């Protein structure tokens, strides 16, 4: 009898940890992940067809995130076209980028020398080649900037010429404000994407807020 009680006491903590783990996994899959994938976006924005969608017509993974910026599109657009680790930065958390061995400096003003972005140019997330730079595939000045990674492996090319797209779309809102909508579409949801999805959300949310603060003049040029 005493031996059974000892075993039961040992099993109770293990069972509690298992239940906690399963509960955390359920919450992440059913609550946190759907919220992260549509942070800030309205139902209409989720359903809207945006520039770049046609490049991957049947994605396995899509995120649509958005923020309202109290500024017209022409005040926001220059911040978008100068993005890049080797240019104006990604406007996110530099301390976290440094921890990820991706140090960069976020611009606090518009740089005229970085405004002539063209289709075919590359936009780097980090200095160097990892992660691979995005290629600019479409530009609608003042409206939309679409970046993409080409499908490099034979397996990926079975899903089409593009592995993923990243679109930045500006749409007018009430009272002179603008909605910045960022949509990512991935042709093939490879397993490693699931492991980094939460981190990508943190960085992209930081980027959206960073662009908003700069366009609204909350961050003063040094």
Please provide the spans of the model-predicted regions.
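Helix N-terminus capping/helix-initiation residues
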Residues: 41-43, 120, 200
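Short alpha-helical segments used as structural interaction elements across diverse proteins
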Residues: 4-7, 106, 202, 209
């Amino acid at each position: 009898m005493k031996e059974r009680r000892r075993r039961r006491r040992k099993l109770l903590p293990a069972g509690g940890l298992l239940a906690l783990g399963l509960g955390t996994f359920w919450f992440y899959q059913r609550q946190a992940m759907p919220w992260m994938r549509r942070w800030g976006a309205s139902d209409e924005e989720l359903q809207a067809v945006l520039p770049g969608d046609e490049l991957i017509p049947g994605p396995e993974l899509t995120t649509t995130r958005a923020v309202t910026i109290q500024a017209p599109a022409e005040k926001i657009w220059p911040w978008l076209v100068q993005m890049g680790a080797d240019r104006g930065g990604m406007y996110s958390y530099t301390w976290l980028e440094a921890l990820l061995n991706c140090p960069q400096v976020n611009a606090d003003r518009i740089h005229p020398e970085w405004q002539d972005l063209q289709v075919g140019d590359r936009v780097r997330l980090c200095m160097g080649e990892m992660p691979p730079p995005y290629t600019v595939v479409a530009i609608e000045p003042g409206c939309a900037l679409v970046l993409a990674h080409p499908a490099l492996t034979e397996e990926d090319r079975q899903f089409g010429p593009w592995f993923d797209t990243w679109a930045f779309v500006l749409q007018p809102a009430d009272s002179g404000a603008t909605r910045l909508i960022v949509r990512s579409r991935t042709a093939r949801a490879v397993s490693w994407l699931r492991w980094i999805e939460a981190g990508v959300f943190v960085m992209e949310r930081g980027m959206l807020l960073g662009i908003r603060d700069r366009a609204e003049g909350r961050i003063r040029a040094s």
